[in-house]
Design a protein with these regions (language model features):
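Acidic, serine/threonine-rich low-complexity disordered tracts
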Residues: 1-84, 153-265
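Acidic, serine/threonine- and glycine-rich low-complexity intrinsically disordered segments
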Residues: 90-201
Length: 265
């Protein structure tokens, strides 16, 4: 991993959500620049700049308004400097002061643009920003951060399989953390690159299932959470990755997202 070298990535997200009787297709385009800044206190330090976030398609007008507020809040992280451990988990945010300065402007916009709808959103974000651990827990699920660092520095013995357990956040706003068992496989490609494939399935945790049932108000619902992906590396440079998440919470809640990340030439 070459220090101070910047790589540019394009991410395309295509998906479908269903909340009660409302079903929506959506498409998002994202561009990011990522620079490795070196090893500091056993953490890999990265500077990440988001140069584009475009919500190209979202059918439901109510969900569009929610997406608009969410995207504006996430804009405070358009430039973020983070410390990652060897497992790809964010452990430190180095530019928290700059992020808080940006939040004050976003907070003013939310108050003027959506005075009623944004009240609880603002209160929740203010609480999160006062708690670094909670802030890190949430920002790790920003699309690019989550996908890029998902199997950061993970590898398997030649011809073997590695088993990983990760905690995933549900995609419906319930705030439930879902344990997922992941099966990681690796193979060498003819061009010298390495391909890593994984499959992940939800662990049947009774406490998690109970919380999801409370959220959906369905005492008999059997949740499903599945993930699949492919990562291609040239040495330690990520060339491309496919990332699919499927979540189903009973009859009325469904989400399927396909994320495609490519290195810009």
């Amino acid at each position: 991993m070459e220090k101070d070298k910047t790589f540019k990535y394009n991410t395309e997200i295509i998906g479908t959500t269903k909340v009660h009787s409302v079903k929506s297709d959506y498409k998002i385009r994202i561009k990011n620049e990522i620079t490795y800044k070196g090893l500091e206190d056993d953490l890999y330090r990265f500077n990440i700049v988001e140069s584009l976030y475009a919500l190209d398609d979202y059918e439901d007008p109510i969900m569009t308004q929610i997406a608009e507020m969410t995207n504006r809040i996430c804009s405070i992280y358009k430039e973020i400097e983070i410390g990652i451990n060897a497992e790809g988990i964010i452990e430190k945010v180095f530019n928290r002061d700059q992020i808080r300065d940006k939040w004050q402007k976003v907070k003013a916009w939310l108050t003027n643009a959506h005075p009623l709808e944004s009240y609880e959103v603002i209160r929740a974000k203010e609480f999160e920003l006062s708690n670094e651990e909670m802030e890190i827990k949430n920002i790790r699920f920003i699309h690019f951060l989550h996908q890029y660092f998902f199997i950061f520095r993970q590898s398997v013995d030649s011809g073997g399989t590695k088993y990983i357990k990760k905690n995933e956040m549900d995609r419906f706003g319930a705030g439930v953390v879902i344990p997922v068992n992941i099966n990681l496989r690796e193979k060498d490609l003819e061009n010298g690159a390495i391909e890593r494939n994984y499959e992940g399935k939800m662990v049947r945790d009774n406490k998690v299932i109970e919380r999801l049932r409370q959220f959906t108000k369905d005492n008999y619902m059997h949740p499903e959470y599945k993930m699949t992906g492919k990562y291609v590396y040239d040495n330690i440079t990520l060339l491309e990755s496919d990332f699919t998440i499927t979540e189903e919470l009973g009859e009325f809640y469904y989400n399927h997202s396909y994320l495609r990340l490519t290195l810009e030439e």
